[in-house]
Amino acid sequence: MLIDFNEIQEIKIPCMNDGTGMMTVKMYNDENYRIIPTRIHKGGSIGTHTQNSGDDLNYIISGKGKAICNGAEEELKAGVMHICPKGFEHTIIKTGDDDLEMLTIVVAK
């Protein structure tokens, strides 16, 4: 299977999960997983929410931020992956000057 993200329309999402600011994404969805290249822009965050659909894997490509998963804070920077297991609560907050760019994969369970 080949997924061509060049063919997927980019969309802007304000205040994701009652977070702040704007993020830009391209979404691929099927019954087994979602694959979402994501950029969180200046002042942006993904609000605190419970991960109900499956494990949420966020590989950081560039930028800086922090994730808080079930109360534990993690530093986000290029080359690290934040994993929020299904049923856990988390938020992602951009903290650096540049966009926080990540590849999110949600694996249905």
Label each residue range with its predicted role:
Residues 72-86:
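Short acidic-glycine-tyrosine-enriched beta hairpin
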Residues 86-109:
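Ligand-binding loop in jelly-roll beta-barrel domains
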Residues 33, 42, 53, 72, ...:
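A generic "binding-loop/recognition-motif" signal
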Residues 21, 36-51:
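Conserved short histidine dyad/triad with adjacent acidic residue
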Residues 41, 51-67:
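Short, conserved beta-strand element in jelly-roll/cupin
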Residues 1-32:
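A short, N-terminal "cap"/entry segment at the start of jelly-roll beta-barrel domains
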Residues 31-33, 42-44, 64, 108-109:
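Short, charged/polar surface micro-motifs in flexible loops or helix N-caps
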Residues 45-47, 66, 82, 86-92:
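Histidine-centered metal-chelating micro-motifs
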